[in-house]
C-alpha cells in the first residue's frame, strides 16, 4: 500500500513540475469487473478506462488468481486491454488467491 501511494505521489510530483502538461487521474472501483448486471466483463471495464484516457488509474476491489475470477490476474488482464502498466497490492488472501488494489499507469512503475 505504501509502495502504491509513494508511486502515485512521485508521479504527481514529477508531472506537476511541467506546467503545460495535464495529469489525468482516475479512480475506479471495478468490483472485480462485475457490472451492475452481475456479468463479469473485462473488456467493458477496459473500455471505460480507454474512453477516459487517464495517465494513472487507481483501482479498487481487484481479484488476483482467485477461484472467483477463474484464476485470472484481473489487473494484468486490464493492463493488456488498456496498454497501461500494472502494479498490484494485495490486501488479503482470498478464495485461493489475493484481493486488493492496483494502479495502471502510462509510465512504468
What are these regions (language model features)?
Residues 53, 83, 106-108:
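Residue-level detector of structured alpha->beta connecting loops
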Residues 4-15:
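Sec-dependent N-terminal signal peptides
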Residues 15-81, 88, 92-101:
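N-terminal, active-site-proximal structural segment of metallo-dependent hydrolase catalytic domains
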Amino acid at each position: 500500500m505504501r509502495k502504491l501511494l509513494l508511486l502515485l505521489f512521485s508521479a504527481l510530483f514529477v508531472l506537476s513540475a511541467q506546467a503545460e502538461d495535464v495529469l489525468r487521474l482516475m479512480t475506479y472501483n471495478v468490483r472485480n469487473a462485475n457490472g451492475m448486471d452481475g456479468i463479469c466483463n473485462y473488456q467493458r471495464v477496459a473500455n471505460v478506462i480507454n474512453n477516459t484516457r487517464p495517465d494513472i488509474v487507481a483501482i479498487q476491489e481487484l481479484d488476483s488468481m482467485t477461484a472467483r475470477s477463474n484464476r485470472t490476474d484481473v489487473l494484468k488482464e486490464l493492463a493488456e486491454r488498456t496498454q497501461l502498466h500494472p502494479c498490484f497490492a494485495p490486501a488479503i488472501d482470498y478464495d485461493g488467491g489475493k484481493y486488493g488494489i492496483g494502479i495502471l499507469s502510462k509510465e512504468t512503475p
